[in-house]
């Protein structure tokens, strides 16, 4: 087992990474204050791991809360089901909410914990690659709104993150690829050697090689922890973690939540960010193509939806959380391994990026 730390002073917490951690209650016990635990999961993950985790937490009074699965259910109605369960079971302020599942479950369970009786403890137990390397670390919680993704939520840090890498053995290939989009992001924005490592190890990752996956998770979490420790509430540096997300969130919102997986939309959005970075003269064509190839090798879509026009993108991006004073800030690459958050671009460059023929770009690789 490996242990990392998210350094936030008195609110610091550990990230445990290893095999079989779901069966080690001694890892969670120090982070559970009371006798009540609510495990929030979904209809897909619960049959696989809920009984196992409940057994490990047998010393506590365990309440299972099983939600419908999918991004389409990341809303107020589903959030109320968590509150219904907690209130019906008379859970008090010393309860601990445990999020067992992917990013949707982590975001909603964390938001419920932030709100319930004005805040109770919670623990992240992510079971997808995307949630293990990204959404479980950093305290972003929330739900979607019909007009925009993750527009209702709170910064609320967990007490611990427990990553059992064996859970990836039950992950569908499409979900694994979606998680790799976030892994690749770290190489692009802040770790050029990691980018080269990913190029050398992509096939091992897709084949679920345990050593390769553990290393990718460790390096991704270390990068995320360092950024969160320096900028918890996304006032500057942390926003660079959103490479590809502004374009990607527009895709998710327009196509309907869940039609494109989050990681798939981020991948296509990252291609657009690479294209715009090249048009600004910050990276060259070979570097743009290198990024696209790596996303392709991960089994990800690299062409935005053909039915989305530049006007569609602009409509949805206008609701992005990085808009300040009416000006859209984008995360782009100043160079490979270095990202910036900027509004220093012309409308012409943005329009050219939105109008680019990505099918033709990919065809020439």
Swiss-Prot record:
* Keywords, in A-Z order: Amino-acid biosynthesis, Aromatic amino acid biosynthesis, Cobalt, Cytoplasm, Lyase, Metal-binding, NAD, Nucleotide-binding, Zinc
Output the Gene Ontology terms for molecular function. 3-dehydroquinate synthase activity; metal ion binding; nucleotide binding
Entry's Gene Ontology BP terms: amino acid biosynthetic process; aromatic amino acid family biosynthetic process; chorismate biosynthetic process
Q: Principal place where this protein is found?
A: cytoplasm
Pfam name, any one: DHQS_C
* Coiled-coil segments on the chain, per record: none
UniProt pathway annotation: Metabolic intermediate biosynthesis; chorismate biosynthesis; chorismate from D-erythrose 4-phosphate and phosphoenolpyruvate: step 2/7
Question: What EC number(s) would the UniProt record show?
Answer: 4.2.3.4
Family annotation (PANTHER family): 3-DEHYDROQUINATE SYNTHASE, 3-DEHYDROQUINATE SYNTHASE, CHLOROPLASTIC
The entry's family comment says: Belongs to the sugar phosphate cyclases superfamily. Dehydroquinate synthase family.
Q: Which protein, by its recorded name, is this?
A: 3-dehydroquinate synthase
Task: Give the organism, scientific name.
Answer: Pseudomonas putida (strain ATCC 47054 / DSM 6125 / CFBP 8728 / NCIMB 11950 / KT2440)
Species lineage: Bacteria, Pseudomonadati, Pseudomonadota, Gammaproteobacteria, Pseudomonadales
Question: Which gene name does the record give?
Answer: aroB
